[in-house]
């Protein structure tokens, strides 16, 4: 972070001379200076350069108006403003939060001015770092000699072997030196929640509107187990979203609890919907308990929000209506809901606490914010026993956490704090909506076919678009009003061949064919359905990536329309069986797969498979115990009718079990 923007647009030569001399002096001590003669050019550069650490301009010409423009982009960056001796100025108290540093046009004082600039920039760098990350950076800079773990000792051990040296060179010095032992007292403890680790947790909680937050270094699969182990006692009953992630199933295999499943909806495209409002009522839950012969009321509920395909619940309705005291929202796919108004009432931590309710929200920070893989968080709102919770936390947390994952969690929170987070989300949402509109435009301009987008006809309003019973663009049956809404940054593209009512056309282009082509292009699809493709527009997606995806989709249409040979469109697929694909063309491949889908009624079978829940012969925990005891056998899928499954059966992605352990397959 060593870029400084200089606006040198004064008509007075002595001012210009000072600006250029300042630039030379800064360059000589390692800064990169970018000089502009137009204000808007400089503003555009600031918007696109996160490594900027200072802005220099003439106060006589621009005064506070330019400061405010810069502050809207970065409220903390130092503004080094130069004033004439005879220039007066007024600043209101409310404007003193802008980081202003005043200097006079004195060419003889330039070395001293640059020293002061360096000090201000150092302060800026310190200010933007959150507590744990700051402590970690400071420790790494001290170059201490240690005689404890890890054994590579800041990378030294790797450099004693050719293979290790290559490994070291690939990851770099700071990666090695920041991998340190939990023995370092000045960094506190993740397990004891002390020192800078505790400061990081408090910092994160304030950013995410939680009463308490915990950092998880091995993913939300673990976060879910921590929450479940605390919330679900042995012999207890738990309400479980049937669209739960497999980690929730693993929790039920570990803990001796009885699940009562809340059944979500699903549409013809295979898109996972939400649990209907009626399923959250006291009467419905009572009926489910009676049907299973369960006498005790559920102690806990687990709800997936949002769904894998980007559908949010009105969480305020659930928090206020669901008659269970402890509710866990598995929000692995939406760690950004606190940072833009469109997500109001869409998150577990949003809004005020609900009296008598304990709310947990688990989030995969790494999935859609900026953090390393496995970085996850648990947020809590309400009263709970921290000591008991920490036993569950320690049960699932390594005693040798990778501190770079901890720091990335904290940095992610720092990036999203305040107006900066809103601005980041706004850019992400705007880019996603622009992409959606471009797909629609290309479709309207096409004489025959193009990809469609699963969304309402009108997306001019920037919001999470509601699913309702009036406009059935979504294809869900008997949808509740004011209950579910679509996240604008989760984009599902539809290929020809299937309509929203589940009707298969005579000709179709299965999504797997398109996904294969995109893979050749270096584009990886998040999830592929029979005729749908899910794309996630995260913070890391920029205009270049968006345009590349549009170009690739248009190119697929070009190849398809000219009926190119498979080896030209899908060379990787062709290489797997050159004889079979030798003279095959792309339309023949697509139509052939489509005919198989029609013949075997794949969308209909998928819908029915999720619509009818299997019979629970025993709990997942007891089924797993039978496997441990060796009371299981392997069998072919065709032989499973009337047998009890010892394991879960699931497609991945999305990792939502079709069959739970302990359920009987009834054909």
What is the role of each PLM region?
Residues 1-4, 50, 211, 234-235, ...:
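A short, charged/proline- and glycine-enriched loop
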Residues 2-16, 56, 238-241:
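Short hydrophobic beta-strand segments
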Residues 6-8, 82, 150-152, 241, ...:
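Short hydrophobic segments within beta-strands
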Residues 13-30, 39-57, 62-80, 84-178, ...:
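Non-catalytic terminal extensions of PLP-dependent enzymes
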Residues 23-26, 31, 36-45, 58, ...:
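Conserved PLP-enzyme active-site core in the AAT-like
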Residues 167-175, 214-228, 282-292, 480-481, ...:
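Short, composition-biased local secondary-structure segments
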Residues 185-189, 209-215, 271-279:
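Glycine-rich phosphate-binding "P-loop"
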Residues 187-197, 213-217, 304:
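Short acidic-aromatic active-site loops that bind/stabilize oxyanions
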